[in-house]
Regions:
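Glycan-recognition and catalytic cores of secretory/periplasmic carbohydrate-active enzymes
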Residues: 19-270
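Bacterial N-terminal signal peptides
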Residues: 5-15
């Protein structure tokens, strides 16, 4: 019985033990080729629909022919950049860098915070800026797009854009709260920002980013616990506050001797 059990166990392991490295490499190479070709086609397809004047890509291909921060900039453009970094360095060095330069030139509306740029008029889509919308769009651009981009590329012009947006968002913190002035108190935006400021702290060592993250976390840990809120959504939007608080928790666990850490966050980290 023991011998039979050993034989069965050996037979289960044998494919892995005796796999041909050359076959594995060939299979992995084919999978990588398929993925890279798809990435290349994705970029080529979107660039065919870029605005011929500005070179920016639209929000979608059906009706929203404008560049915006929360969709075009956050969810599409950065992954075009990543795709071309792997598949086409000429496009990476050319159109991808050009889009970054152009979107800051034409879409920045309040300081470095971008607004929707309408292709038909080559101007802002609305007559006046809406600050909550600008902060939301910038936070999405940071968290959804620029963070993964920077974590692969390292220091680059996109790093400057990300840090500039994080600085600009805090410059427009106008919501008076129990922990001081905040740029937002929504679960989604605050969660985006806690993730952004936490990563920026690890990237740069700048304690201002850590302190911004702690201040946002204190609002929730000390006064407005998400688990006590009327609604805690764990979908693609509401879940951001959980991720953000988790990243601040980790910083607090590592830096528990720093006086800037909110007391409740420190207690939970212990």
């Amino acid at each position: 019985m023991r011998a039979m059990s050993f034989l069965c166990f050996f037979m289960l392991l044998s494919p892995a033990l005796f796999a041909d490295p050359a076959q594995d490499a060939e299979r992995n190479g084919e999978q990588a080729r398929t993925a890279f070709l798809a990435c290349s086609r994705f970029v080529d397809g979107w660039l065919q629909h870029a605005d011929p004047v500005s070179g920016l890509i639209p929000r979608n291909l059906t009706q929203d022919f404008y560049w915006n921060a929360k969709d075009a900039a956050a969810d599409n453009y950065p992954f075009m950049v990543l795709s071309t970094w792997f598949t086409n360095r000429a496009v990476f060095d050319g159109p991808m860098h050009a889009i970054l330069t152009t979107e800051q030139r034409v879409a920045n509306r309040v300081g470095v915070l971008p607004d929707d740029f309408l292709f038909a008029t080559q101007a802002f889509r609305t007559e006046t800026p809406n600050m909550p919308d600008l902060i939301f769009g910038a936070s999405e651009y940071v968290k959804d797009g620029l963070l993964p981009l920077n974590e692969l590329l390292g220091p680059s012009p996109w790093t400057d854009r990300m840090l500039g947006l994080l600085d600009g968002i805090w410059e427009h913190a106008t919501i008076d709260s129990e922990v001081g002035m905040l740029p937002s108190t929504s679960h989604e935006v605050s969660g985006d920002l806690m993730q952004g400021y936490s990563r920026a702290y690890w990237m740069t060592g700048n304690t201002a980013y850590r302190d911004h993250a702690f201040q946002l976390a204190a609002y929730f840990f000390e006064h407005h616990s998400p688990v006590e809120a009327p609604e805690l959504r764990l979908d693609d939007h509401g879940c951001e506050v959980i991720s953000g608080l988790s990243e601040v928790y980790y910083i607090a666990a590592r830096d528990t001797n720093d006086i800037c850490i909110p007391q409740r966050c420190r207690r939970r980290a212990r």
